[in-house]
Amino acid sequence: MNDQLTEVYASIDALIDYALAHLDLDPRNADWTRNQIFALFRLDSYPGPKTTTSAASVSDVVQDIVGSRSQAPYGEKTPDPLLAAFRAAATTAGLFKPEEGPAYADTIMGILSANPADLDDRFLLVEHRDGGMAAMQWFYDYCVSNNYVKRAQLDRNPRFDSHGLTVTINLAKPEFKNMKKAAAGNAVAGGYPKCTICHENEGFAGRDKRTLRTLPVTLGGESWFWQFSPYGYFDQHGICVNTDHTPMHVDRDTFGHLLDFVDRFPGYFLGCNAALPRIGGSVLAHDHYQGGGELLPMHKAATWAAFTLADYPDAVVEILDWPGTAVRVVSKSRQSIIDVTDIIREAWVGYDDAANGIASHDADGNRQSALSPSAIITERGYEMSLIFRNNAISDEYQIGRASCRERV
C-alpha cells in the first residue's frame, strides 16, 4: 500500500473517532460505518488503525481542533479540519477531483450521522430529562457537529450592534430575489422534492442535504417539523415547516401555532414573513415559520404608546418605537393574545387610506396588505409582535415602500 492511501485511511480513522466522540456513533457500528466510507472509493487495503504510519499526523489534526476551541465557539465539535485533511489526502491519492470534495465530504458526514429516528429518540430523552430548551441546545450542537450548520462560515459573518438595532451580513447564505421563484417555492428540477424546504430533503443527495436532520413538531394538532438553518442570520436560527406542501399564509391559526411552539420551547421565538411577494420570504409555496434562540431587536424595542381593548382588559397593545409600523400584544392569556392579534390582522388587511397611499388591494383585486407576526414568552406572559406590511408598487416606488408609522 502506498503512502498516499495510508494518509487516506488515517484521515478516515480520524473521522470515525470524531463520530464516536461527537455524533453518538455506537462503537459496535464503527467497522460497519468505516466500510461504508471505504465502499465509496472501492478501498480494500485497510491495514487497521494501529498499524498506520500516519497516527502522529492525525493526532496533530485532532490537537489542532482542540487547540482552536478558544478561537471558535464550537471548537472541537466542528469537523472542518478533519474533512480538510481527508479531502487533501483523497485528492492527492487520485480518489476524486478537488471540485468534488464538498459533495464527498457531505456524503461522509451523512454516513457518520445518526439516522433521523434515532436522533428524534435521543432528543425526546433529553427533553424528558432536562426540558425543551436543553433538548434544542443538544440538537443544535449535533447539527454543528455533523457539519449541517456551517459554524466556520457563520463565525466569519460581520455583525454590527448599535442603537437598538443589529445588522448582519450573511456572506454564505444564497438569497432568492426573483418573485416568480419565491412564489414557486424555489421548485426543484425534476419535481422531487417539491421545493427546497420539503421534508423529503432530509438526507437527499441531490441538494447536498445528506446531513440534514429534522425533528417532528405538533402545532395546532398538525404535523410540522423543525430544522436548523445551515447559514443562519442569528443564534440557533431555524425553520418550522408544515409537513404538507401547502402555500404560505397568515391567519388566526398561525398565531396559535406560534404560541404552541414557544410553549414547548420558551427560550425561542417563532415568527413568519408576510405571505406575499416582495415583502415575504424566498419560499412562498410552502408554509413555514422562522425562529431561534436569540431575541431580535424588535422584541426588545421600547414603546411610545399603549392601550387596551374594552373586551380584552387582560391584553395590552403597545405601539413600538420602531422604524416600520409595528405593535406588540402582551397578555398572560393565550386566548386573548390570539383574539386581539386576529382583530388587528383583519383590520389591517382590509384597511384603505388613499390620502396616505395605502391600498389593501391592487387594481386587479389582489391582496397587498399582510402581517409579519412573531411570538416570545417573557415574565409579562406571551408577547406577539406584529409588523404591518404592504407590497404595493407604483411608478414612484417601483420596488415597493415600507409602511411607516408617521404615514399611518
State where each predicted segment sits.
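Active-site microenvironments that recognize anionic phosphate/pyrophosphate groups
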Residues: 1-247, 323, 338, 347-407
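Catalytic or ion-translocation cores adjacent to nucleophile or general acid/base/metal-coordination motifs
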Residues: 253, 262-282, 291-352
